[in-house]
Each structure stands twice: as structure tokens, then as C-alpha cells.
Amino acid sequence: MKKLFGTDGVRGVANVYPMTAEMAMQIGRAAAYIFKNGKKRHRIVIGKDTRLSGYMLESALMAGICSMGVDVLLVGPLPTPGIANITSSMRADAGVVISASHNPFEDNGIKFFSRDGFKLPDETELMMEELIFSKRIDSLRPTAKEVGKAYRIDDAQGRFVVFLKSTFPKDLDLSGLKIVLDCANGAAYKVAPAVFEELGAEVISIGVKPNGTNINADCGSLHPEVMSQAVKEHGADLGVALDGDADRVIFVDEYGNVVDGDRIMAICATEMIRQGILKQNTLVATVMSNMGLDIAMKRAGGQVIKTAVGDRYVVEEMLKGGYNLGGEQSGHMIFLDHNTTGDGVLSALQVLAIMQRHQKRLSELALVMEPLPQVLVNVRLAEKSDIMQVPEIAKLINDVEEKLKGEGRVLIRYSGTEPLLRIMLEGSDEGDIRCWANDIASIVAQKLGGEARG
């Protein structure tokens, strides 16, 4: 069982175990040992978002990697998908991202990409942990010319802008569109506005003044109300909101209504079916996706395959089945024809291309899917346990499932990145499912000593 790595790398409060400089250095040493193979000079890319603690962790990781005789390529603040892309395009041995994605600035994280730009498999992360905790590489200390060097890649952002624009159809541009763009004071604060402006859009940018502590603070994809208000104030055609590391995106239409990841996947997947380019007419989503997505895909002649929550599991299923589109309700979308991981700006470009090609507003395109009412309630628990072993909880859940009569569902799962139990209900009557979700959350909190949060 993994001790350090969760569903999206190592994550926690910066400067508190395991997110300390000492552990970052150990992780760097273990990674360098694993990716070092043969006599040639090896290179690992390090990128980050705009958190204050990024400087500390970047320096520690760099020291650990160089101390094992591996060179480091520093790209500075860059979206997570940009780090994956540059790792692959520069033929580096691995890429490291220092980010806690949509979490507040106090948190930070470390996650890896392999040389092909995909996230590491569980086995490699387990190997890294074994090297750290067994201390068996502590005595390995290259000296003299064998010590690694660090280089700064000054044009990393420009390279990624060029790549992103290359994914947009050559016969289209964004002229005539007014876009509100919220970069969450995060990693895409320079890249995203440049991409949309260079393609011809009028861009109203918010969340583009990072100061180390304002990443995701009342802005970005977790706060679409900010972008929604700006769209209405400026009479914009739509709003695009990224999270701190720009691997996810949420939209609002011209009326300020939120268009989430499920609807975006429905728009893109049905368009790809029409063009004959959706492989096996199959979309890969997670168990959190609304049943309305399944209905929309079936109507278009496609199907949805569901995985566990986490974009890494979506990508694994896509690679295993040979599919080219997948994503999550939260706004992670993977277009494998273009990139290897969730990419907020790239996903936005694909939606904008559909709007421009068909000369339709986002509100029109969003009608392709009608979501079933869905309610999510979180319970903060001190530790994870099997709630179905508590008779009162199990009975209530079974009773609710019986009431839904196959026209909805109950999904209960632990978060992979936070100490939360997520209780999600779908059904035709929002009042009923909200009441039942709160009932389940209350009894879980009562029996297991937690705190319910609607």
C-alpha cells in the first residue's frame, strides 16, 4: 500500500510532512535513481504553479535530483499539461509538477510524468516509496563531474503557446468572440491569454496577477460565479475558467450559466461522432459523471465507459481500450489525439472550434445534454473506514436505493486528495435526492464522528 502517493501524486500542507523540503529532496533522489538508465546524461524537467512554497520545493527537488547525477531543466510557472508536453518534446527522462491543482495556496504537491508525457503507474510510485523509506540509496553520492547540473528553459511558455495554437483548426480563428478568461492566479496566467488573443479573440482576463498566496482564492474553476458576473457585465460570448495548474476548465455561456465537464464532454464527443473521429464512438468518463451524459451519447450513437474517479484512471482506460476522448465532470478533459493529460486551455480551444465552425452559441451547444438532478454532500472524517459495515448507515443507503427504483443512483466514495467522504445522489426529483443525501451525511457524521458539509 502506498504511503506517500495519492491519486494525484504527493500532496499536503507545504512545510508539513510529507510536503517538506527534506521529503522533496528524498523524492528527487528516488526519482533520479529510477529514471537513470545507462551511461548517458539524464534530464528531468521541473515545473510549478504560482504558490509561494513552490520556490522551496523546487530548490529541494532540484538538489535531490542533481545529487544523484541527473540534470534538471527548470521551466518555472507552467500549466501541468505544458510540463507533460515539454517533457515529451524535449525527450527528457521524466517531468515533475509542483502543484496542488485547485487546492488553496497553503497546500502543495509533487507529481510525475514519464518521458512520454503520461502520469506514472502505481508500480513506479511504489518503487519510489520503497527507495525513500528503505534508505538503500542514501549512500549513493556521485562526485566531481558526475554531479547533475540545472538549466533554465527560458522559452517554455512560448513553446507551449505555439503547441496549443497548433491544436486549433487552421481554417478557423476566434475573431468576433469576446471571452472572459479566469486563470485562477495560477500557472496559465500568461499562456492562456496569449493563446486566445493570438487566435483573434477579444479577451477580458481575470485572475492573472498571482502573488504567491492568491492562487484559486475566490477565482478559477471552483468559483465560476466570478466569471459568470463578468460575462454579464461585459456582454461576453462566454467565460472560460481554469484551476491553479490549468489541467481543468469550466465554462459559462453568454447568460452566465455554468457549463460543466459533463456537458463539455457531450458537446465534444457528439461532434467527434459526427466527424467520424471519435474512436469506437466511445467516451471514457468517471462514475461521478451524470447519467444524462450516457443518455446524450446513446442518442448520438455512442457509448460511455465509466472508471474510478481520477484523470489517471480515465487515461489508463483510454490507453487500454484505444479511445481518444475522456474526462471528468470537474472539467478535466483528455484529448489523446493532442495531449497526454487533462488540459484546460486545449479543451477550451476544442469547444471554441465547434462554436466557430457551426456559428452557434455555447448555450445552444449545451442543449445536447440534459443532466439529471445531482446532489453532492461531503462529510469530513478523521479516518477512512468501510461505512457499509455500520448497520444503520447500510440500511439507510439500501432504503434510498430502493426509493430511486433504478431511475437514479447513490454513489459514495472517499476523496483521493482530501479527508472527505463524498455522498452523491442522482434522480428525477431534486428535492427528494437532496433530502436523502443530507440524511445519509447526517447518520455518517453521527456514527463516525465527522462533520457534514453541503
From Swiss-Prot:
CDD domains reported for this sequence: GlmM
List the catalytic activities from the record: alpha-D-glucosamine 1-phosphate = D-glucosamine 6-phosphate
- PTM summary: Activated by phosphorylation.
Q: Which cofactor does it need?
A: Mg(2+)
Query: Which InterPro entries has this protein been placed in?
Result: A-D-PHexomutase_a/b/a-I, A-D-PHexomutase_a/b/a-I/II/III, A-D-PHexomutase_a/b/a-II, A-D-PHexomutase_a/b/a-III, A-D-PHexomutase_C, A-D-PHexomutase_C_sf, A-D-PHexomutase_CS, Alpha-D-phosphohexomutase_SF
Q: Which GO terms describe its molecular function?
A: magnesium ion binding; phosphoglucosamine mutase activity; phosphomannomutase activity
Which Gene Ontology cellular component annotation is one that this UniProt entry carries?
A: cytosol
Q: How is the cofactor bound?
A: Binds 1 Mg(2+) ion per subunit.
Q: Which UniProt keywords apply?
A: Isomerase, Magnesium, Metal-binding, Phosphoprotein
Give the family this protein belongs to, as stated in its UniProt record. Belongs to the phosphohexose mutase family.
Q: What does this protein do?
A: Catalyzes the conversion of glucosamine-6-phosphate to glucosamine-1-phosphate.
Classification via PANTHER family = PHOSPHOGLUCOMUTASE (ALPHA-D-GLUCOSE-1,6-BISPHOSPHATE-DEPENDENT), PHOSPHOHEXOSE MUTASE
Q: What is this protein called?
A: Phosphoglucosamine mutase
Q: Which gene encodes it?
A: glmM
